[in-house]
Design a protein with these regions (language model features):
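C-terminal catalytic histidine-bearing segment of alpha/beta-hydrolase fold enzymes
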Residues: 83-135
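Short substrate-entry loop that stabilizes the transition state in hydrolases
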Residues: 45, 61-67
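Short beta-strand/loop motif that positions the catalytic acidic residue
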Residues: 56-58
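Short alpha-helix in the alpha/beta-hydrolase fold that links the catalytic acid
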Residues: 52, 66-77
Length: 135
């Protein structure tokens, strides 16, 4: 099983990936996560390195959860442990996966906009990532 989340849900995904502590959210569960994928997470809040293969997608123009925070966090985490891959999409904003954000819009002072090229690439990469780590 893998955790996949978007924005605030991506923060939950990274939090669960830190310790594989799925029981924080499902106390009676015996489920174990094997991989995590986070779309535009707030990386500054992710203190501990994920303990499982993790894939992070973010837009270079995201002003809500800035790509620089994820780039810095991944650098701090280093290369020890399970693989962590960060994909930064040039020209993409927060919410790039949501087709209804076309044209883009402001929300709480942040620009949100669909980006079809980023979606196509992220979908392909996510499928490959899940195939690698779940099969």
């Amino acid at each position: 099983m893998a955790a996949v989340g978007f924005s605030a849900g991506a923060w939950v995904t990274l939090s669960v990936a830190e310790t594989n502590a799925f029981d924080l959210f499902e106390p009676q569960s015996k489920l174990q996560l094997r991989a995590a994928a986070a779309f535009y997470p707030p990386c500054r809040g992710a203190a501990t390195r994920p303990g499982m293969p993790t894939l992070i997608f973010i837009g270079a123009l995201d002003d809500w959860t800035p790509a620089a925070e994820c780039t810095n966090r991944v650098a701090i985490w280093g290369n020890e442990g399970p693989p962590i891959e960060l994909i930064v999409y040039p020209g993409a904003y927060h919410g790039f996966y949501y087709q209804h954000l076309q044209p883009g819009t402001m929300l709480f002072g942040h620009w949100l906009e669909y980006n079809g090229a980023a979606v196509d690439d992220a979908t392909r990469r996510l499928r490959q990532f899940l195939d690698r780590h779940l099969n």
